[in-house]
UniProtKB/Swiss-Prot annotation:
Function: CRISPR (clustered regularly interspaced short palindromic repeat), is an adaptive immune system that provides protection against mobile genetic elements (viruses, transposable elements and conjugative plasmids). CRISPR clusters contain sequences complementary to antecedent mobile elements and target invading nucleic acids. CRISPR clusters are transcribed and processed into CRISPR RNA (crRNA). Functions as a ssRNA-specific endoribonuclease. Involved in the integration of spacer DNA into the CRISPR cassette.
Organism field: Geobacter sulfurreducens (strain ATCC 51573 / DSM 12127 / PCA)
Protein name as annotated: CRISPR-associated endoribonuclease Cas2
Gene Ontology terms for molecular function: metal ion binding; RNA endonuclease activity
Enzyme class: hydrolase
Length: 95
């Protein structure tokens, strides 16, 4: 079962920040500078957390992963000023 996650991070080093930014594109949709919306099952969240752990400096950096619950039941109530907020919808993936 997929859950909807919001991932936010504060990375002190520009090189690590760029690396994490590129990595996160493989797991979700970019919302703002250091914020991603991700729709992940159990295996993908474990893979994402492992990838994050390899990049961050645990003494300097901070990553928050907010689990909003089962993706099919979550209807985020988001106020957006400026660019429209578009939640991730369930889509078929062709491999």
């Amino acid at each position: 079962m997929e859950h909807l996650y919001i991932v936010s991070y504060d990375i002190r080093n520009q090189r690590r920040w760029r690396r994490l930014f590129k990595t996160m594109h493989g797991f979700g949709c970019w919302l703002q500078l250091s914020v991603f919306q991700c729709r992940l099952d159990r295996i993908r969240i474990i893979k994402m957390e492992a990838a994050i752990n390899e990049i961050v400096n645990h003494a300097e950096d901070h990553v928050l992963i907010l689990d909003l619950g089962p993706a099919e039941n979550v209807k985020p109530k988001v106020s957006s000023i400026g660019k429209t907020f578009d939640p991730i919808l369930r889509q078929a993936v062709i491999v």
